[in-house]
Each structure stands twice: as structure tokens, then as C-alpha cells.
UniProtKB/Swiss-Prot annotation:
Family as reported in the entry's similarity comment: Belongs to the polyribonucleotide nucleotidyltransferase family.
Cell location: Cytoplasm
GO MF annotation, one: 3'-5'-RNA exonuclease activity
Database matches in Gene3D superfamilies: GHMP Kinase, N-terminal domain (3.30.230.70), K Homology domain, type 1 (3.30.1370.10), Nucleic acid-binding proteins (2.40.50.140)
Subunit record text: Component of the RNA degradosome, which is a multiprotein complex involved in RNA processing and mRNA degradation.
HAMAP family noted in UniProt: PNPase (MF_01595)
Domain S1 motif: 623-691
Organism in which the protein naturally occurs: Vibrio vulnificus (strain YJ016)
Protein name (database record): Polyribonucleotide nucleotidyltransferase
Annotated gene: pnp
Amino acid sequence: MFEKPVVKTFQYGNHTVTLETGVIARQATAAVMVTMDDTAVFVSVVGKKEAVPGQDFFPLTVNYQERTYAAGKIPGGFFKREGRPSEGETLTARLIDRPIRPLFPEGFNNEVQVIATVVSVNPDVQPDIPTMIGTSAALAISGIPFNGPIGAARVGHIDGQLVLNPSNTELNASRLDLVVAGTESAVLMVESEADNLTEEEMLSAVVFGHDQQQAVIKAINEFAAEVATPSWNWVAPEANTALNEKVADLAEAKLVEAYKITEKMARYDRIHEIAAEVNAVILAEDPEADAKEIHTIFHDLEKTVVRRSIIAGNPRIDGREKDMVRALDVRTGVLPRTHGSSLFTRGETQALVTATLGTQRDAQIIDELTGEKKDYFLLHYNFPPYCVGETGFVGSPKRREIGHGKLAKRGIAAVMPSIDEFPYTVRVVSEITESNGSSSMASVCGTSLALMDAGVPIKASVAGIAMGLVKEGDDFVVLSDILGDEDHLGDMDFKVAGTSTGITALQMDIKIEGITKEIMQIALNQAQGARKHILSVMDQAISGARDDISEFAPRIHTMKISADKIKDVIGKGGAVIRALTEETGTTIEIEDDGTIKIAATEGAAAKEAIRRIQEITAEVEVGVIYTGKVARLADFGAFVTILPGKDGLVHISQIADKRVEKVSDYLTEGQEVQVKVLEIDRQGRVRLSMKEAVEKPVEAEAPAAEEE
């Protein structure tokens, strides 16, 4: 039934990788099953043979989905099936998209969809690297115009050594988690999180990963040669030379002047005016002219004007030199009732950032294929339409917002205290209130400030900076603190976050080939100078965590009880702890070792909860007089509650000095009485006396003061 499948197996570091096609999904344009030590991902590619007429963009969609059966699990929830993509799936989809998108040829606007499905998972092998390899292989055998293949590698830094594709276990001991993707000759994408590594160490890791992934590229080329799919007969559309010249004649000089307007919205208004004028003139002369084509040519002319000016050494769009950072304004404590807040403004980019402290119960539970884990540090990034002066839909976060939030979180993670050092769940929200480039790095700066304002003992201040590149032939200029236009019209988006001593996150997206190690070195060094400048300004506002947390934040009090007393504090069906939390207005968490954490915004509430827990867990002592309540009466005596959950018996002979005929003549239920503990037998039963308490009062000894 099946033709003989094509299988390619190769060694990749410590892992064996297998590429296979020809058996599954034969109606797709291309399909590959990639396996890496029991982690298997099925990747399909479908491309439409024709583009939608008049379409002036490339509709590439990448879907990445993890099936729970891959880990031998059944999905939770009512419907028991996978639903919308998780944050992790969204981030992996972006990781696949970013290095392949620049490799489709200019003018290719046919729709292409990549669907990657994780069908088997080894808990020690993350699926993202095999997915990127499988996507590259599927595109290579599809016949679709694609200037690949690409390779992908994860790089760790363990005991001073770079490690290729470290396992999940090894990553726990690594100071670096870096993913690099690229072609045979160039790096295209870097995504990383680091523990204060130097610029040299980061660059070495990027180069190491790119060198090692050549084995992947070689294997995919051999695999594609064996499959031998004919290439599509696609020809790039011919340039409309006459229209290009017409648009340039009408607009070039005006655009040169427009790009000298430093204020963003005024500049945009002028550019829109020029575009409208050009459109009107050309359509008046030729009503059959394509307005979309005019728009595309006009945009290309904008790009040419800006790039040519930068390469010539002229001041940038907003008048800065290549290595200048925009004006900074840093404020903390801007919102009175939040636990921590900051307003970070850099030029026309602004982030309003808040930090909220919660208990460990507020941690996010992440159910991944490789296992369940808790996340005590959350960072959410919001990009509302008003921040760029537009209207638009407001709803659940888009892929870009999830990606930017994750990047900012990577930048801060290295300086966060452990849950043992600071027993709070911390949620940071960055609201982008103005945007003109590098809002994710503004979020890093704002987060560092808000955390300090909230009293979170982070190890150091963290700042982020976005670098750009304009390269024409052998000439290039590296730009610090890029504007949105410079990002859009340039060749590289290079984001670096770190402290004064090292890098904590690096993200790089390159749109062209030919980025050399020298260019990356210049960008890293230039970013270091910019980062230190921003840190110096931030430190003037706040240079360390506040001495105390906000009065509106919950204060966590820790106490320890014997592990065998946990059941007493919880009570039957949770009745005791439920009553404690409701009556004291606190949140109480009990760990298996007997550690109890009590969170309360008011100190009195916490003290009351502690007092009641101490009562519940206290041990009855022989010879001590207690004030108790009569719980019930019997013919032979009375049961008295002396501590919560602890009753003792006052025998009828121990009620008074004289003979007692009837217990109810002396006691009633609910009556408070003084009793002395006479004995605790082997079964834990407590024998009490009222008459001994009256005759020979013995007070409980105060605990001896501890010596300092």
C-alpha cells in the first residue's frame, strides 16, 4: 500500500535523530516524523499553489500542538480534550516561525501552513528542538520556494563548559538556556535566558550552537536529495519599473524631509499626507493603476530613504547618533494602593508596571507533557491599541503579547529570590501606555523598579535595551535603543537584558544573511554601554528593595508544629482550618513537614491565628492548672475541655472536698472551671481535679529565656 518510506538517521550530540516521510499524511504538501530519543513530533506543511490576487503580504501560519497522549495522560477538565494553545505552545510556535519566515523569497505571497504535533515525549528531551528540525526538513522536501534548510540547537552552560542540547535534568544545573537557529552560513534567531553571563560567554554560546547545528543541516540536505521533490515553478513577480520611478519622482524628496520630523505622530501624519498625494496623482493619470501596488512601492521607498540616510552617517529619525539612548524618566510608587509600581519612560515608549504579592497558594500550576510544576513568578505584558494611537479589539492576549511577556520574564528571572528566601508568589503586569520601539525592554526596566518598590529582595537592578542594524553590502551601522520604524525598516532586532555585571536574557531576530560574529560582538558591546547608562538612571530613583513590603500586601508569618499535629490543625474534613481562616480573616498553608505559613494584611489577625494554632497543638502538662469548659456531665463525673480538641475527666470524687452525691448540683455544661491535671495514662486519657486546683494552685512555668 505504501511506497518505501525515506528514513534518515543521524547523531546529534548525545542524541539520535530520525527523519521519516512517505507513510503518514501523504496528501499534505510535505510531512515528516522526527524522533529524538523517544520524543517524536509530526510536522506537516501545506502550501497553496496560487496566491490570492492582489495580496501584498506572505500569509505564513505556524501551529504547534502538544497532545497529552504523548505523555500517556488524559486531559483534565470537563471535556477531556485539548483546547486552545497553552502559553508554552504559543511560545514554541513563535520559536519555529521566527527563523523560517525570512527564508521565503521576496514576493512569494502564497499561503503556507505548518502544523507540528507532539505525539510522543521523553520527559528529558524537550520537543522544541526536534520540532524546529522537523519543520526545516518538511519545508526542504516540500518543493515550496524556501532558502533553507535551517538547523536548531539548545546550548547550556554547566561547570564552565558549553553543552549541546542539555537534558531537562542538566538544565537545572545550567547557567544558560539558549536556543539558536540558522542556515549553513548565518545565524537567524536566538532566544535565551542566562544567569549573568558575560558578553563573551553569550557570543561563544551562539557561535557554538551554530557550529554544532551544521550536522542537522547536512542531514536535512541529504534527506531532501533522497526524497527528490521537484521544486515549484514559481517566478518572482517582475518589478514595475515605470511605477517605481514615478513614485520616487513624486515622493522621495518629500520623504527625506518627512523623516527629519522627530515626533512620531507628526511624522506619521506627514507621511500619510505624502502617500495620499502620490496616490491621487498616479490614479488621476492612470485610473487602472493598482492602489495596493502603489502602497507597496511607497513603503519600499520609505525603507530605502531611511536606510540610505543611516548608512551615510546622518542623524537618525529622531535626531540621535547611532549609540545614543533616548531621554529617560523613571518613577516609582506611582499607584497608591498597589504593592509596588513604577512608570518607566524612554522617549516615546512608556510602561506602567505593577507588582502584586500573594501567597504560595496563588502560584500558577503548569501542567506540561514533561510533568507538573509551580510558577511563583508571573509576568504579564499588555499592549492596548491606544499605546500607538489606534483603535482596536481588546481581549485575550495575542501571540506577540505572550512572547514579549516571556522575554521580559526571562530578563528578570535570574535576579528573583527563591521561594525559600521570599515566600510569596509575585505577579507583575506591564501595561504599555506608549510605544515607539522596544516596549518589551521597557517592561524589563519597569519590572525591576516595581519589584524593588514592592520590597521584593531582587539580587540586582535589571535593564533592557533593543539594538538594530542597517547593512548595505559591506557597510553596516549598529543602532542603540531602536525606534519602531528602525525595527521595521532595519535588518535585525537584537534585545539584551541584564545587570551591571552580566546578561540575563538575549533575543535576536535577523532578517538577512551575512550577520558576522564581528557585527554581533559590536552589538553586544554597544548594548552593554547603553544598559549601564539606563541602570545608572534607574538607580537614582531606587537602587535596592525597600526595607519593608507595602502595608496593603499580605504579611507571611511562619511557625512550625510537629508533623503529627497537622491532622489536629486541619480537623475532620478540613473543619478546623476552615473555621480558623474564616474567623481570623487569614490565609493558612500547611506543608508536610509541619511548617505553617499564615498570610494576613493585619498583624492582629495573624497573631490571633497563631495563638489558636498554638492552643490546638499544645500538649497537656501534668501538674498545670487550666481554665476549661464543662463539655458534658456523666453520673461518675464531668468531661472538661482544657485545650481545643482535648478533654479530660473530673471524677465525681475530685469535684469538691466534701462528698458529692450528684454532679449536676455542682456543674453545668458550658461552665468555666479551674482544673489541675493529675495524670495522663498510656492511652492519652487525662485525669483532672477541681479540688486540687483550689487547694494547691500551680501555675505553668514560663519558658526559660534563650541566651543570645
